[in-house]
Amino acid sequence: MSEEKPKEGVKTENDHINLKVAGQDGSVVQFKIKRHTPLSKLMKAYCERQGLSMRQIRFRFDGQPINETDTPAQLEMEDEDTIDVFQQQTGGTASRASVPTPSHFPDICY
């Protein structure tokens, strides 16, 4: 009987996956989630913990966007894999006026 209990424990452990969510600021939040649970659950929990809105950020795994309906199993995620979080950019590009040029700073070597 004692041999069966570890097997059950292994089975339960295999049903879950540990994932890391890495923010642009270098912070890492760890989550344990079932392999067939939609990642929207993890995404919402991350936003609540960090005080962010789902509309402000985007989640990516291996460079690809994650949909709320995706599961770790569908994306072939493995234990300890990392999901990257990016602020959603709104608006255009940086203004050239904000980039220093030699004429504005003659003492700086370029």
UniProtKB/Swiss-Prot annotation:
- What does its PTM field state? Polymeric chains can be formed through Lys-11 cross-linking. Cleavage of precursor form by SENP1, SENP2 or SENP5 is necessary for function.
Task: Enumerate the subcellular locations listed in this protein's record, separating them with semicolons.
Answer: Cytoplasm; Nucleus; Nucleus, PML body
The record ties this protein, via InterPro entries, to:
Rad60/SUMO-like_dom, Ubiquitin-like_dom, Ubiquitin-like_domsf
Q: Where is this cross-link: Glycyl lysine isopeptide (Lys-Gly) (interchain with G-Cter in SUMO)?
A: 11
- What's a single GO MF annotation on this record? SUMO transferase activity
Location in chain, cross-link Glycyl lysine isopeptide (Lys-Gly) (interchain with G-Cter in SUMO2) = 5, 7, 11
Keyword Ubl conjugation included in the entry's annotation: yes
SMART domains in the record? UBQ
Where composition is biased (Polar residues), the residues are 89-101
For region Disordered, the annotated ranges are: 89-110
Propeptide found at 93-110
Query: Which family does the entry's similarity section mention?
Result: Belongs to the ubiquitin family. SUMO subfamily.
Subunit structure, interactors included:
Interacts with SAE2 and UBE2I. Covalently attached to a number of proteins. Interacts with USP25 (via ts SIM domain); the interaction sumoylates USP25 and inhibits its ubiquitin hydrolyzing activity. Interacts with BMAL1.
Q: What does this protein do?
A: Ubiquitin-like protein which can be covalently attached to target lysines either as a monomer or as a lysine-linked polymer. Does not seem to be involved in protein degradation and may function as an antagonist of ubiquitin in the degradation process. Plays a role in a number of cellular processes such as nuclear transport, DNA replication and repair, mitosis and signal transduction. Covalent attachment to its substrates requires prior activation by the E1 complex SAE1-SAE2 and linkage to the E2 enzyme UBE2I, and can be promoted by an E3 ligase such as PIAS1-4, RANBP2 or CBX4.
Question: What's the protein here called?
Answer: Small ubiquitin-related modifier 3
Name the encoding gene, please.
Answer: Sumo3
